[in-house]
């Protein structure tokens, strides 16, 4: 007989790296499909992945080779009706496969891995069928869990939510628990299993357990004890004290402990690894607050308690009293109450175990010391509890329901589910529904005698069933008999029976009766009174649980109505004014994951009230408010409002309070106590929490205003109260730390996993600062040092520098200093790259300079410095550089391809850049321009105030959108680069001043004139110029010298290799064009107009009307630009500042296109007189170069009759390009924008080919910035060109020109320091010698 295959161990040490996490991203997509409005945390998705792999193991156990084999396995192992649904879904997947893959789970990854699981290769359709079944089950689980989460008003699916919801679904639980591959690993019942949790999980679980424990204490006090207190004649005070001991002290302690833990979690700093709960236990332990547990244990475990209780319950009057309260209440008091009184005893031992677990998991030394102090302080109590327990030694058997009354802990629940399936397998003759389909919990088991039967019965009690079995004695060894241990005799559905207590008689003792609805009854008898009490306690608690729950809820509701929360009068405390549409509005049907309403708008007072609300804490609102409040409130005003909010007056005294005051006593009415506990304390605590967040994350407010800091310190020092002491000290500690950091400077001591790579040197050596330049420094080190500099600048930008577009306002130097530094650095670096190119007069030098810049771009890409990449793209697309056709055509093909791929990042609204940014791991330097664009669009497209019933409410929804963008910026500010700073290079790049003393207009004119000088218009060959450099132009390459130095990495991921040599590098050109446009940080406000508003022409407008008859000639990538209405939208280069009021019209740049031999031949017979003269033949003769646009022969002094025709385009795919839904959107006044990028080299739209009559003619005018749609013309260099010999070429017709004057450029808004010599005497290579 063939041996059954062994289950595949998916999570063994060997296999776990191959499988763990394989399905998580796909499962998230499944979750978003079944519940788009919810989210799921990582833990829950990993749990579902584990279940799916269990299911995969179950399917593979049958060794399937065909689809039919899998289908048969599903029919045999899946419960009904889920088997039919799963099969139908899988068959549908196979049918749809013919058209497309409809599945979200990664079939292509699972298919090759199944060979390892099965031991043989299976057909792809078999894998597809299996994956379809797995996806159906995962969707079913997520749908079920999502429904549960939605019903409890949560917004994130957790692992616990999945477990709880699956427990309620009998079909799923049966499918996963019917064999040994079920939830065994999740059903550890030992308390020590919680030790596997981390600190935060332990604290979170403890809060949930304390709340449940508090409800059980409320049940004892408010239901059972109130029943005793309701008849003072029947029960003496001594009777009540003996039964309930000091349970009120235990309740008070539990409320205090729960409040402390919740406050600690709420006040936990984001930088802390976990909440520091040790101080909560330490404070109470030092106060000996846990001592009441010793008294209660002594009273409840003593024999006197049981004797007194039994005597009391034996009195007929007592029985009648309890019976009159509610049906079954007498039995609940007699059997359930004694078990409930044991709950605090065992809960105290739970504290001892919890403190040890927290100490083992704590990552903070101070917290471990607090926990150790608490453990030491409780050692005497623990010794006393052990001594009392051993003295009275109550016997606890497996069936003894001493566990918490309402429900077993989650671990016990899972063990019970496992137990249910095991029990069913051990019962011979089982019929009907499975136990797991009608029960959720296993309660207890044990022997009972059925009156009238010969043999003893073994009873299994569940929350929905009671099963009576007869043991199979000695038959399991005989052939042909079942291996089950028990044989089914009776089943009782708990909701269909009544439990009746039976008094002891001579016929039977320790008996109870089960009476069904048809009046049939069965009597069971236990062996002792203790066993009977255990069975009755379990049966009565199950039967009357809902009754007792309703009684407790009714009491709690009544107390709340009788003791309303009284608040001060709105006349004396304006933060208690009732909510109305005139002071606050909320988002429609939108709540955060915690169920907290999201504020749309409100008055400042209402925003402050919700910021420190007494009913709940909203950390997201606190972060957003402190990031954005400066746009509607000054820091001094905010501090005043918070101090006013903190000083809460007492409410008007009641009559009882007035009477106590008249007697000279302190009023202590119940509603005043509630006011202090439920309003004053939480509000003041949350105000301190706001202060702590303010000084921790926005201390620059206090650095700019020392009076603000003095006011805060003065207020903090005046706060009194033991409950506030810890948080006041925390705030003072943060202030001291910030002051110290301010005095000492920012520390950059960062420890990396591996040492940074050594500094790379080329021609210039260490210490030769005066020789530093683009060609003398190593391209790797240029990219590294620029990346370090730009990363530092990026990481210093604060959210407050962005909110309200303050970098465009009058006080921008004060409000946005770091952002302006980054903008100016990027402008200078872009201009420096342009200057290096155009000042290289010699053609060979110029090609080498451009190649070197592209090498720097490659290293930028591998360092994830997207800002640097787009700086180079902007420089290459500038007017003065873009026109250098001969230079670009002399580049190596692979370098042109690298440049084209980089250019594609900025195309189509930066779609490929956004995809790339999402796919990489930090560290990185994102392109800041997109964030500034989105912030400006949000600021300009949404009003600052909302009109509600004639009132202006602060539009906080607008601030939240801006905060979301700044939050995305901040998520990339945390990870530094593992690189060394070279001080001289840092100083060199920080002091770059390519403009020297020239104005922006003068510098732009100089660059363009220089560009015309080195490559005149329509020249067939570039002019000859002598070389300036004496050193070799050969590049050192961009492969680091890791072999020589033993270095590892330029980043934490390893030093970049060239793009063309890196096999797994993502190619920007290979990203699918059909991908949906990313919406990272894009404003989503419905108020954002899709067309420019009326104010779009203002200086600060985001929406700039496109004017094809104007241009901007600056070379900064931060500047505004006027773009054509083309199919591809690009941000172009412009100025840091607003456009000139009357810009002159530059000439259009004729189109470029690649030379097509076939097209040339086909049109050879159509040559017109307008064509330029032919180039003289050379060896080998180059092909004829077509003019950029047809021009008339002769003197060019008249206008053309019509615009030139658009250039031929490259073949495009069958699918038409996307049509923009709205005009191009631009921003002005310092945001980042790009020059239009060269697309191999560039494309241009016909919109830019304007009638020459509209512009004057000037040979020295820089053309407008080209549009990125026309391919650059490919020049085929002759051998003489390749040897850089330049014979004189025949004249070519002049290019279309525009005005005799350059366009008027905007003035600068900041002053440049004259740190360099005059511009025109600066050579490209400072150490070069002019050849003679």
From Swiss-Prot:
N-terminal Ras-GEF domain span: 595-739
Question: Which keywords annotate this record?
Answer: Disease variant, Guanine-nucleotide releasing factor, Methylation
Ras-GEF domain residues: 778-1017
Q: Which residues carry this modification: Asymmetric dimethylarginine?
A: 1321
GO molecular function list? guanyl-nucleotide exchange factor activity; protein heterodimerization activity
Q: Where is the composition biased (Basic and acidic residues)?
A: 1153-1170
GO biological process, any: Ras protein signal transduction
Q: Does the keyword Signal apply?
A: no
Q: What is the effect of changing residue 334 to H?
A: In NS9; uncertain significance
Q: Where is the PH domain?
A: 442-546
Biased region (Pro residues) positions are 1173-1184, 1201-1222, 1259-1269
Ranges for the DH domain? 198-388
Q: List cellular component terms (GO).
A: cytosol; plasma membrane
Disorder association: Noonan syndrome 9: A form of Noonan syndrome, a disease characterized by short stature, facial dysmorphic features such as hypertelorism, a downward eyeslant and low-set posteriorly rotated ears, and a high incidence of congenital heart defects and hypertrophic cardiomyopathy. Other features can include a short neck with webbing or redundancy of skin, deafness, motor delay, variable intellectual deficits, multiple skeletal defects, cryptorchidism, and bleeding diathesis.
Please report the name of this protein according to its UniProt entry. Answer: Son of sevenless homolog 2
Q: Native species of this protein?
A: Homo sapiens (Human)
